[in-house]
Amino acid sequence: MIENDNTFNKDEWEIIEKNYRKGGFSKISKAKKKNGIINGTIVNKKMIAIKKIKFDDKIQFNEVNNLELIKNKNKEMQISSIIDYFGYGIKGKNKLYIYLEFIEGKTIYELKKKKFPLNEKQISIILKKCLETMKFLHNNCNLIHMDLKCDNIILKPNNYDNNNNNNNNNNNNNNNNNNNSNINDDNNNSNSNINDDNNFDIKIIDYGLSQKIGDLKRDHYGTYLPDECILNNVSIVNYTFDVYSLGFISFELFYPTQFEIKPIKLTHIYEYVEKSQISPLFLNFIKKCIGRYLDIDVLEIHPFLNENYDNFENYFKFLKQTPLKRIKYRNGINGENDILRINNSTTITSEQFPNNSKMIEFGDDFNGIINVDYIANKKVVILNNPNYNIINLDFCFSNVEYICIKGIGVLEISKITHNSLETFIYEGEFKNDFILKPYLFTNTKHLILKNYKNYIRHRGIIPEGVTFLELSDSIGIEVIKTFIHLPKSIEELCFGCTEETLKQIERNLILQSINFFIINGKLMKFSKNNNLEYYE
């Protein structure tokens, strides 16, 4: 609820501390409303953060609109990491004042400057709370934060409110200098309280750059966004922007000093994090965020974020089922209205296809001709019959991001030359002398070739960027010896072989960057003696 008169009147406020925090576009002061009421909401003597922004045509009320939306959506959800919003005021032609909940605590950036250490358990708690907030923003508000970073995450000890209220009651007559001293003392105390692992909460702040999923990307963007976003190779806002940012936040949380991460190639990022002294599970989580091929539902159950670190089996069972779920999530495919199923042989023209359908599935009994126009604008395509007649196959998949092909005849896969496929599942056959060509999967991250058991003859056959690779369930040891040519981006490798072959697999045959293996349907790892063994 916003008052009719939104004029900011300084006389109505008691300024406790002016400009105690500054951002790129704003200054924040600590204050109390003298009459205890803000836009009809009774706040009594509650401390308020007044965010002052000099707005222009590009920023204007974007943050106000986002905060209004988030506030309304959070009434039912009650996500604790969402900051309370009380309205706004305007002064002059270009000064906007936003009234927010004042959070006692320090940003992660401030803690890092003081070289305050965080262990991996504390980091996992922080990241889990971040994911909860991201999931709420994405699913309930249809918003991407766009500027997730350590400076926009405040750590607040859970017992801080009571201590702060007592301090405020005892010190109402203190001057600003005394208040500043108390704040610093309190925050120093808060650092020790954070050591109690789960005895703290987080608040994610600053929604000035947030945008709706599917919007055109604006000129303003946050600190940690993908290279393709900064270099204007992508124009549509999607959830992977926030996931990517979380990967850099994860890495920074481990180190007590602030450093600048400039846009660099993905392979260089992998090499950098692999040299760091962090656990394999934490490293795996970071690489998944930076790789951007998992959605939040999958990241939430990652073993690093859960106390049961050994629960790998359920994690990987879920992982193998996620490609379609992920692409649905990303493209807003929420129900049957978004999915078009063709389950008969009736002749269909492209004009009969609804424009709003985002996914198309051709059933086993469809034996008509599939024209390029049918699937040109679809994000998800599922072909269940190996005998489809597809016209212009080489241009069919220019915009498709997920495809599952049961088979289009031997070698027909080689005709797919222009694609943006992130997830490719192919269950067709390969000739014995067939060699994969890297141009087939230039943008693919999740690659499943269920019948491929030929040699990986040289580096580049599987392109850099693939993170999940599944091959045939009958791989021989000579083919496994060529796995050394797989790209360093691969994190999970899935294949099958005989028990005799399994005994011959040595650590030097598999890239060190591959953390986990699913062999014959079971999760395996190399022991300290470099022998393959099952996870128990």
From Swiss-Prot:
ATP binds at residues 20-28, 51. Residues 161-192 are annotated as: Disordered. GO terms for molecular function: ATP binding; metal ion binding; protein serine kinase activity; protein serine/threonine kinase activity. Signal peptide: none annotated. Its EC number is 2.7.11.1. It catalyses: L-seryl-[protein] + ATP = O-phospho-L-seryl-[protein] + ADP + H(+); L-threonyl-[protein] + ATP = O-phospho-L-threonyl-[protein] + ADP + H(+). The keyword Kinase applies. Coiled coil: none annotated. Residues 14-305 form the Protein kinase domain. Its cofactor is Mg(2+). Keywords: ATP-binding, Kinase, Magnesium, Metal-binding, Nucleotide-binding, Serine/threonine-protein kinase, Transferase. The keyword Metal-binding applies. GO terms for biological process: signal transduction. The active site is at 147 (proton acceptor). GO terms for cellular component: cytoplasm. Belongs to the protein kinase superfamily. Ser/Thr protein kinase family. This is Probable serine/threonine-protein kinase DDB_G0268550. It comes from Dictyostelium discoideum (Social amoeba). The lineage of its organism: Eukaryota, Amoebozoa, Evosea, Eumycetozoa, Dictyostelia.
